[in-house]
Amino acid sequence: MPPVRAEKKRKTDLIEQVCVTNKAGELVDLEDVLEYGPYSLTGILSSEKDEQEPLFDESIVLGYSIKISPVWTYNLKDVPEKETMSIWIVTPQRRYGILSPSSEYKAIYEQISEKNRLFYLIKTKFKDDMISGTLEDYDNYIEVLKEKLELPSCFQAILLVQKHIRFLLTQMVATSSLHVWSESPFFIRIRSSYEHLILQINKNIYNARQERKKSKLSSNNPSDNNTTMKSSLNQALTLINLPEQPFSISSPTATPQLGVVKRTSPLRFPLNDIWLSGLRIVDPNIESISLWKRIQVSTSPKHQRYISLQEVCSVIAQQLQITNLEALNKLSSHGETLLQIMHTAFTWRGTKLFNDIKHAIGFRSSVQQARSQFRGYCYDYLFMHCNNGEKTSLHLLRTLICMKLDFSNAQLAAKILFHFLLFDIGSGLSGSDYTYEQYINHSAVAFSFTEEIFEKNFVTVLPDFVKLFSISFGYWPAFSFYDELLKLLRNKYPKVYSSTPNLCDQVWLDRTNLFPCNRSTRSTLPYRPTKLLDLASASSCLSKKETDFKQDTGLYSYNLEKVEALKVSPDLQTGIWSCPVQNCLYFAVCDNPYKPSQVIYDHLLGHVDSKFIFKTPSNSVRSFTNKLEHIMYNIN
């Protein structure tokens, strides 16, 4: 037999007082070396541990400083006892484990430890789900992080994930286990929102690897330096001899609009999201979090579904001692962040405040989108109102069917039929329509009636049934069932119909059946001032204009025509229009300085719901304010 060759294994050393720097000598995060390497690591040797007895004695004296350069990569090793991961630097001869940082590197090392523990918990959760065979969604990951890290709320866990999102994506994308992570619901959720960041990470890693290859080639072949210099010289000569390109003047670009607050780069929810299709995801700041806490404190859980944006503005205005208009500007400037927070909360998404903020920041809901959101909200409503701790809507359906449907008790029968309506809508297809015939057919089958008998008895409890409809459920007018129900109420009970509020006046839908990907500026009002045209004084300020909506909805838009006293036209030099209302910081950038933008008129109509004072009061301005106050009184 041939003699067994003793292979040389790596020795393991531990380093204390670690400090990591880049080429410029600046302190950097070691776990960014995959993108921005190479780095240099310095420290003091603490102890050593042999993997296998080496053939030659290459031990290093302990207690001496050591420098490892260049560092191109690192390894993470699980530490199950502490529920975290440790960092190891691997060289061709040795492995170096990091024990402790130096005093100047302590702050960065604490962030590294926080990232490693966060990734360990996410990886362990995904591994356990793979073993059990059930992959849970993103919300379950957030709950696990909240419990393991002992955070006060799930929102803090979401903030922690967003804080270290680049590191998490690097670990999931840059390693060879991308095909495994692609099945994780956690990775699918963050990948759809951070695609631009993934592209940037891959580009940086590719550039770092190319630089590493070049450094290896230059170190292995020092004689090739002359050839590289010749090639670079030839490239320079070819660039010099290129034909001269003709000079052209590009078209002037539009003036960029300045935001109220500094936001991050636009990130978007996936298009199949039923609540916020195409809305940006922004990092919350201190002001947005404080506004959210004020909203939570000022509203009780019973009234979460019914509170409106105007009521929230009045409450915040009283707390901060500002006007309602300033409170509305604050809420709308942080509208995307508030929607993101409410989207993660179970009881807030789909509420009236949720939809009001969507309309305030210019988000339009299509009919299909409204139906999907409404069905999801009905399902959530039944989930929250299940009895006996049962968390299935099927249990509620069984209790409804087992109850005797006595039409002599109109109020009880109306409640049972209304809850069955919510169950029937919530269990249907997301974007499909729901008709009156479907409700009669399904209800008759569920409660063991014929369709004729059930419809006759249903008409008797129709007034009590209609009273249960509320705008808090969102987009009732998105279904043809609501229009058919109002027509039946108008024919059978005209007096009740005259006193019943029409929810079409309070809901704004985009009837184009398109899913908008970008946040567009609101060019129309999200409500309908019904008594506006009856005022003779308001006819000179407002004009009626029919839109492309269906005639059965009765939705109209109202726009200001001209108000010369308010200087509607922007500045000719800058193209910027600033609002003349005192303490209002709103401004608009118009592409055509000779033509006022529609956004200006919409902003002026926003002052109708607040008390305001113009900067330069005159007789014409006073007459205009009186008209607006008169309009406001009739709208309310």
Curated annotation (Swiss-Prot):
Compartment list: Cytoplasm; Mitochondrion; Nucleus; Chromosome
Xref: Pfam families: DNMT1-RFD
Keywords: Chromatin regulator, Chromosome, Cytoplasm, Mitochondrion, Nucleus, Transcription, Transcription regulation
GO CC terms of this entry: CLRC complex; cytoplasm; heterochromatin island; mating-type region heterochromatin; mitochondrion; nucleus; pericentric heterochromatin; rDNA heterochromatin
GO biological process: CENP-A containing chromatin assembly; silent mating-type cassette heterochromatin formation; siRNA-mediated pericentric heterochromatin formation; subtelomeric heterochromatin formation
Origin: domain of life: Eukaryota
Coiled-coil blocks: none
Function: Component of the Clr4 methyltransferase complex (ClrC) which contributes to the establishment of heterochromatin by specifically methylating histone H3 to form H3K9me. ClrC preferentially ubiquitylates H3K14 and ClrC-mediated H3 ubiquitination promotes clr4 methyltransferase activity for the methylation of H3K9. H3K9me represents a specific tag for epigenetic transcriptional repression by recruiting swi6/HP1 to methylated histones which leads to transcriptional silencing within centromeric heterochromatin, telomeric regions and at the silent mating-type loci.
Protein name in the entry: Rik1-associated factor 2
Quaternary context: Component of the Clr4 methyltransferase complex (ClrC) composed of at least clr4, rik1, pcu4, rbx1, raf1 and raf2. The cullin pcu4, rik1, raf1, raf2 and the ring-box protein rbx1 are components of an E3 ubiquitin ligase, whose activity is essential for heterochromatin assembly. Interacts with pcu4.
